[in-house]
Amino acid sequence: MSTYAPFAKPLYVMLKPVGAVCNLACDYCYYLEKAKLYRENPKHVMSEELLEKFIEEYINSQTMPQVLFTWHGGETLMRPLAFYKRAMELQKKYANGRTIDNCIQTNGTLLTDEWCRFFKENNWLVGVSIDGPQEFHDEYRKNKQGKPSFVKVMQGINLLKKHGVEWNGMAVVNDYNADYPLDFYNFFKELGCHYIQFAPIVERIAPHRDGRHLASLQDKENSTELADFSVSPEQWGNFLCTLFDEWVKQDVGTYYIQLFDSTLANWIGEQPGVCSMAKTCGHAGVMEFNGDVYACDHFVFPEYKLGNIYQKTLVEMMYSEKQQNFGLMKQRSLPTQCKECEWLFACNGECPKNRFAHTSNGEPGLNYLCAGYRKFFKHAAPYMDFMKNELMNQRPPANVMEAVGRLKIDNL
């Protein structure tokens, strides 16, 4: 008998089939050090027994006819193809009439013709991590021997394109590349990548007894320091404004930039489709290779562990009071400055992970990137207003491209 979640929304838990294991050693990776949480495990590999248990329970816990599996790392392709073929067999075994979709995130360096044929034949969506042109990408994305990875990533992308695999780009915006948004954007356009996520990297350093060095919200501010690779609020704001100017003039409806789509969704009062911009979070859990479930991919810390699938069901963990409180914390912990901000509806304070700054009155809990977001929202507001009006009147938001000249706002 199926166990149904008490809320009419999909239960969503990302899978980590190899935990934090990866063939790269990117300087800014927030997940690589999670392996130190599992030092007692000699092999960070998800067993077939656990794979089947998760798939059966995950599918049966859904209240929707469509089920999304997201495979994340570490580097997902360090599991052999046979593992994912077995996963699909199990998905079909337990589907019970539901439609199953799969997406997988990879650094692209291990892609082969065989992998790409599998993804194409089974309609998998592939997300590729690539930080723009070679100079930007190779600054921080190196292998364990310190050698750059760009050439291998491009070989992988070319294989995806050769086989007609649907793929998206995921780029980290850091201190080094943030000053070149158009170089970044044009690179993806030249690759023929129409769906792009630009993710700002912000991390704090706080040594822990177990060897981890990245801070969680529980680490006191006076014991942390900002990581050198972090993008600054000013850089982030300038990056978004310059990128938006280019996009809104000629690419609306052709190229999809996640943050712009999410902003427009919030502008019209719809769900933004990404937890960082939503009013509450906690809808996207993550399961490690051994069955441990955590509140969020960015909160894989001991204090945010919900339990283990061998002791508790996914429904019990994801709809637990602890997880409910985690999700509501996003809204409840907003400082007064945010609650009174004219742009609160657009960002909802962004990700709690980045809320370690102080307001002008000294109140804690302000998002470190706040100034950058405020600059962007003010800059984009007239165009968001226009696109909102088009959507409300059942017209395509892409009409904004024809109106840019007439609006004569800012410096477009």
Predicted features and spans:
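Short Gly/Pro-enriched turn/cap motifs at secondary-structure boundaries
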Residues: G273-M277, A284, L328-R332
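Radical SAM enzyme [4Fe-4S]-AdoMet core and its adjacent flexible, acidic
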Residues: N143-V151, N158, K162-S276, T280, ...
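Flexible mid-to-C-terminal extensions adjoining Fe-S/redox cofactors in radical SAM and related proteins
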Residues: V300-L412
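Conserved alpha-helical substructure of the radical SAM core
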Residues: M1-R117, E121-N123
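Short loop/turn microsegments at loop-to-beta-strand junctions
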Residues: V13, C281-H283
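Short, acidic, Ser/Thr-enriched surface-loop or helix-capping motifs
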Residues: E288
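Conserved AdoMet/S-adenosylmethionine-binding subsite of the radical SAM
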Residues: E56, M78-Q197, R204-A206, D210
